[in-house]
Amino acid sequence: MTASAPTTDVADRSIWTRGFVYVFAINLVINLAQFMMNTLVPKLAVELGASAVVVGVVAGMFAVTALSVRPVVGPATVRLRRNHLLAGTSAVIMLAFVVYSVADSVPVMMAGRLLHGAGMGFLAPVMLALASDNLPERRMASGIGIFSLGQAVATAIGPSVGLALQPLVGYRWTFLAGAVVLALASLLALRVPSDPPAPPSGRLFSWRAFVASEAAVPAVVLFFLAGAYAGVTSFVVLYGEALGVRDIGLFFTAYALCVLVSRPVAGRIADRFGLTTVILPGMAVFAASFVLLAHARTLGAFLVAGAVSAFGYGVCQPAIQTMSLMSVDKARRGVAGNTSYIGVDLGYLVMPVVAGAVVSAAGRHGADVAQSYSTMFLTLVVPVVLGMVVFLVRGRRRATRVHEVSTDA
């Protein structure tokens, strides 16, 4: 079954094309499964005897294979139908969830994370490219922001569902429920309109096919920001439990609900006034959210921190990805998306391990468990500030040029 290709003029100026609706729905269900499982992976690792550092290693392990497959992701998005790639990679992640369901040791969990990473290495850039293929140029920032709302909705529902389901049916059946969701996404992917593969031109595995140099600066910024956010997803549940805070999964709900409000507004602002007007304030607010997390002691404080984070990372992350996509022509958006996710993968690989090491170091210096996590979250302000510096020095002018080109389209 092969879906028809999208039209050249993407439904004039409408965001909600048939293809975009399909991609939005798939993004929603895949992220629902992801967020159901992601909060359980660190918990299961702890129950299997992992230390804080090992929990960080397990959480970031998928980035190893995600990075390993990057050399073929760019060429694959050009030479193969993107909807077929989406179906196949969804199936790989489904198999990873099956591995989680039978994990009885940390090494088995690591094997599942490696398989998960192989799927994620393809999934994120392919999804981003398919979304941009079905959006008008002048509505790109708004469209990518709305596309990412699928992740926000899943963030609101997934962690709470996973944390509520696990005590009722156990880890095995919770992970298998996620696998069923991924199987449905894989089938739905075959219905997404997709352009036919581009005719061969040049070498298949050249540097240009692997990386879009135009997207290098956004990738570096995303390394710092996504890495800091990976510290949140890896440790906020454990931090809340160490403090005795019940229903800590509502942190993600608060984040997601505020993203539902902030992203459409931020997208319209970026389309009209430029990406910089969203990215810089977003990074400043994101840094402030870590200060709030470090001092959180009650559920209310965690909810406030989650809401602030939504107006920070939740706003600037899709804007930076839009900057990456708009820096190249349509045919190379898969490569640009791949480049931006190299930064994300490296952030998810490095930062949880660094964060876990900070927790362990604080513990060795006499801090209790909760104080150790508090110190770690405060430390995560540093990569956010570094990302801001990189953007100010190397990315600000490029973001302005991207906006000028899109308004002329």
Model-derived regions: residue spans:
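Helix-loop boundary and gating motifs at the non-cytosolic
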Residues: T17-G56, A230-Y239
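A membrane-interface helix-boundary motif in multi-pass transporters
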Residues: P167-V180, A357-V382
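Paired small-residue
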Residues: P107-L115, S289, G300-V308
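Conserved MFS/SLC helix-loop-helix module at the cytosolic interface between two early adjacent transmembrane helices
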Residues: S68-S101, F273
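Cytoplasmic helix-loop-helix junction between adjacent transmembrane helices
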Residues: G112-G150
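Structural signature of the two symmetry-related core transmembrane helices
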Residues: H84-V98, A179, T277-V291
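C-terminal membrane-cytosol helix-exit motif in multi-pass small-molecule transporters
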Residues: A179-A198, G387-G395
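Helix-breaking motifs and short loop linkers at transmembrane-helix boundaries and internal kinks
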Residues: R81, V102-V108, G274, H295-R297
